[in-house]
Design a protein with these regions (language model features):
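Low-complexity, glycine/alanine/valine/leucine- and proline-rich hydrophobic stretches
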Residues: 426, 430-485, 491
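Active-site-proximal N-terminal segment of extracellular/periplasmic enzymes that hydrolyze or transfer
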Residues: 1-46, 118, 500
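Active-site segment of extracytoplasmic enzymes that catalyze sulfate/phosphate-ester chemistry
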Residues: 39-92, 130-136, 141, 154-167, ...
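A long, amphipathic alpha-helix that forms part
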Residues: 6-7, 175-197, 201, 211, ...
Length: 554
């Protein structure tokens, strides 16, 4: 397929590169290392793609698939708070409280193909085919629609793998695992493109995110964790992975009809980081979070637990000695819930990445009266914005948002009261911060090294539009991840639900190449009584292990 041969798009393909960032891509493009991506940039439009706040895959991919902000789709993290409780449970695709844009494509008679999109497990009966992505527990559950597709993939690949095993962060094992999974994702995409009809197709490659978290420092001499010997061994690993993706994209292009519009995107960007801020420890220092006295003491058991965790033995012992029901997110929620003295705690940082006021009539042990809420929240905001890292003398946060500043819709009340935005984009990784809500660091400073993380998510991902109907070589600014859903619907002449928050990116198209966007009065999302995500205990353990390995449940 060559660019701009056909003015009107007849089909759309989205290629997702989870975590891709122009900081990495631009130098490699200029050096000629990624010829396929360079071809797309030269022949299409490109620019940054603004993610959600927070720029976490759970929020971002849910906003991609629905075209709405988290206040409407209801996903605020990889976990969701159980109503009337301090506990959290894992979320999944069933937690999304509104319809995905491909549902509207299917209702319009267009066949869709969906491969490896995060937050699509459990699978749904789409008009076409689906293979679920991140958060799929494993190959022993239902992960595809129609069911015979699952059998086809298992026959073709044997064990079908959805994500890397993060029980180890050893570089060679991680690189090998990501390569094998990427090759499987590529081969699956090519198989489906060849054998099944589609008018809309998406494939998401998760390898960039998985590698960049742990290998970024080897590629960046400015990074405090950079080591010459390690860089000699692993400094080329990120480029080599992107070259594998570049070749995969070239193969995919070879299977696309001339009337295809291609959108290449990432759900967020990436940048180096070196520091960690234990926000619940800071709240404890301020007297806003209080632990029971037995939890506050750094006992022999606490020391031993931390040591076993650091050397990788804690999880093995837990699995060997404890019942399965204790080895899940429920266990971590229980530890947190029982460690905190809620009768004296006024605020806490939850697993969903935000701060919550311990409010009367909302939290089960709430002590903050409704008339105190606004003043306490503003006080907390001002004090946290003033916190500086003692090593860098730089603020920890760039902003601290009220819930209502970011989210609107029927589910907005379920969001945390305050959403912190840490330093992410400083060119010096030593200044960039990972927020951590765990209680493991109970007597230490709120500040520590970010190891094993050497990089974390940023707000701006990548966006390229190429192929049928695209305006030509230029940069486009202002695109947001919620804009992709209405843009895809408009390109295929399907009415856009009026409740969608995104806009049609009309500036990427040649004049007159797509019909005037039409809008429908589809019903706005509602709010169920409680969390909708549901895993069995065994499934929860499998998914939680991966998420903790990535640092997403700290």
């Amino acid at each position: 397929m060559e660019a701009a041969q056909v003015e009107k798009p007849g089909r759309v393909i989205v290629i997702g590169l989870d975590g891709a960032d122009w900081r990495l891509l631009q130098p490699w493009l200029h050096a000629g290392h990624l010829p396929t991506l360079a071809r797309l940039v030269r022949g299409g439009v490109h620019g940054p793609l603004r993610s959600t706040i927070r720029p976490e895959s759970s929020l971002a991919w849910s906003s991609f698939s629905t075209g709405v902000n988290p206040g409407k789709h209801g996903v605020f993290g990889f976990v969701e708070q159980v109503k009337g409780s301090y506990s959290f449970q894992l979320a999944n695709g069933a937690s999304i409280r509104t319809r995905r844009f491909w549902d509207f494509l299917g209702e319009a008679g267009l066949q869709v193909g969906l491969l490896n999109i995060p937050f699509t497990y459990p699978p749904s009966a789409v008009n076409g085919f689906m293979v679920t992505g991140m958060l799929t527990p494993g190959p022993d559950v239902d992960f595809a629609h129609p069911p015979e597709l699952q059998q086809q993939l298992l026959s073709r690949f044997g064990k079908y793998r959805f994500d890397v095993d993060h029980s180890t962060h050893e570089e060679v094992a991680l690189i090998d695992s990501v390569r094998m999974i990427t090759e499987q994702q590529r081969d699956t995409a090519l198989l489906l493109l060849r054998e099944r009809p589609w008018r809309f197709f998406t494939v998401v490659f998760t390898g960039p995110d998985r590698l960049q978290h742990f290998l970024w420092a080897h590629n960046d001499p400015r990074h405090p964790f950079y080591n010459v010997d390690s860089a000699r061994l692993f400094g080329s690993a990120l480029l080599e992975h992107y070259q594998l993706l570049d070749e995969a994209i070239a193969e995919i292009l070879g299977h696309l009809p001339p009337d295809t519009l291609l959108l290449l995107m990432s759900d967020h960007g990436f940048n180096g980081c070196a520091r960690r801020f234990y926000i619940n420890r800071w709240l404890q220092e301020c007297g806003l979070l209080v632990l029971h006295s037995t939890s506050a003491r750094r006992s022999w058991l606490t020391v031993m637990t931390s040591y076993l965790k650091s050397v990788g033995w804690l999880r093995r012992l837990k699995r060997a000695l404890l019942p399965a029901r204790w080895n899940s997110t429920s266990l971590h929620s229980a530890v947190f819930t029982h460690a905190v003295d809620w009768s004296r705690t006024r605020a806490y940082f939850g697993l969903d990445g935000g701060l919550r006021i311990n409010l009367e009539s909302r939290e089960p042990g709430g002590i903050v009266r409704a008339e105190e809420f606004d003043a306490l929240r503003e006080e907390l905001r001002q004090e946290l914005l003033a916190v500086e890292d003692p090593e860098t003398r730089q603020p920890v946060l760039t902003n601290l948002f009220y819930r209502e500043e970011l989210y609107h819709g029927p589910s907005a009340a379920r969001a945390p009261d305050l959403i912190p935005e840490p330093q992410r984009d400083n060119p010096d990784p030593a200044h960039n911060i990972v927020l951590d809500g765990s209680l493991d660091n109970i007597t230490a400073s709120p500040f520590a090294s970010s190891i094993p993380y050497t990089a974390n998510h940023t707000l701006d991902g990548v966006f390229i539009a190429w192929g049928a109907g695209v305006a030509g070589t230029r940069q486009v600014l202002g695109a947001q991840i919620v804009d992709l859903a209405p843009t895809i619907l408009a390109a295929l002449d399907v009415p856009i639900p009026a409740y969608m928050d995104g806009r049609v990116l009309s500036e990427i198209f040649l004049p007159g190449c797509i019909p005037e966007p039409r809008h429908s009065e589809a019903s706005e999302p509602g709010v169920p009584d409680g969390p909708e995500g549901s895993f069995s205990l065994a499934e929860e353990i499998a998914v939680e292990s991966r998420l903790r390995g990535l640092g997403y449940l700290d």
